[in-house]
């Protein structure tokens, strides 16, 4: 091979250089293809796959983040709604309690008023009965004193008439 190169160089020095450079280039290309091109291609393919995966992962993360933000917003709205419901229920419960307390108080006042009126009526009736008993006792004492005295026929007739008139007026009032 060297002999041929030497012959080619003797005839045309430029042609020999072209052949040597071309041969060297072809050998270099063969070596690069055999030893470097596969690993370089693999590295580039891995890099391409990694970039694609990173882009997919970033897109999934963005979608997941948007979904989580939407869920958080929904939870926040639900929490606000729950809080509003709790406040509404507390107000309604408070109003109901207030109305119940007011109703119970009014019923207690009415019951106490009725009991007081009943007690007053009982006391009045007791007092009237006591007065009637006192009047009856007093009347009996007066009658006993009068009976102990000697009655004249005129007094006797007057007492009988008064008694009859008293019976008549008491029957008329009934």
Curated annotation (Swiss-Prot):
The chain crosses the membrane at residues 18-38. It is a single-pass membrane protein. InterPro entries: ATP_synth_B-like_membr_sf, ATP_synth_b/b'su_bac/chlpt, ATP_synth_F0_bsu_bac, ATP_synthase_B_chain. It is found in: Cell membrane. Pfam families: ATP-synt_B. It comes from the Bacteria. Keywords: ATP synthesis, Cell membrane, CF(0), Hydrogen ion transport, Ion transport, Membrane, Transmembrane, Transmembrane helix, Transport. One of its GO terms (cellular component) is proton-transporting ATP synthase complex. GO terms for molecular function: proton-transporting ATP synthase activity, rotational mechanism; proton-transporting ATPase activity, rotational mechanism. F-type ATPases have 2 components, F(1) - the catalytic core - and F(0) - the membrane proton channel. F(1) has five subunits: alpha(3), beta(3), gamma(1), delta(1), epsilon(1). F(0) has three main subunits: a(1), b(2) and c(10-14). The alpha and beta chains form an alternating ring which encloses part of the gamma chain. F(1) is attached to F(0) by a central stalk formed by the gamma and epsilon chains, while a peripheral stalk is formed by the delta and b chains. Belongs to the ATPase B chain family. F(1)F(0) ATP synthase produces ATP from ADP in the presence of a proton or sodium gradient. F-type ATPases consist of two structural domains, F(1) containing the extramembraneous catalytic core and F(0) containing the membrane proton channel, linked together by a central stalk and a peripheral stalk. During catalysis, ATP synthesis in the catalytic domain of F(1) is coupled via a rotary mechanism of the central stalk subunits to proton translocation. Component of the F(0) channel, it forms part of the peripheral stalk, linking F(1) to F(0). This is ATP synthase subunit b. The lineage of its organism: Bacteria, Bacillati, Bacillota, Bacilli, Lactobacillales.
């Amino acid at each position: 091979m060297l002999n041929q190169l030497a012959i080619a160089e003797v005839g045309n020095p430029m042609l020999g250089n072209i052949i040597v450079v071309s041969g060297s280039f072809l050998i270099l290309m063969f070596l690069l293809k055999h030893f470097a091109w596969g690993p370089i291609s693999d590295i580039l393919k891995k890099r391409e796959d990694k970039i694609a995966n990173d882009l997919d992962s970033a897109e999934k993360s963005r979608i997941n983040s948007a979904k989580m933000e939407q869920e958080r917003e929904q939870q926040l709205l639900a929490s606000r709604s729950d809080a509003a419901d709790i406040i509404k229920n507390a107000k309604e419960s408070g109003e109901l309690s207030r109305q119940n307390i007011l109703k119970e108080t009014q019923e207690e006042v009415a019951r106490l008023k009725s009991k007081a009126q009943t007690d007053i009526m009982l006391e009045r009736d007791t007092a009237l009965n006591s007065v009637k008993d006192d009047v009856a006792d007093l009347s009996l004492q007066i009658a006993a004193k009068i009976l102990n005295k000697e009655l004249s026929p005129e007094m006797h007739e007057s007492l009988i008439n008064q008694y009859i008139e008293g019976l008549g007026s008491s029957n008329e009032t009934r």
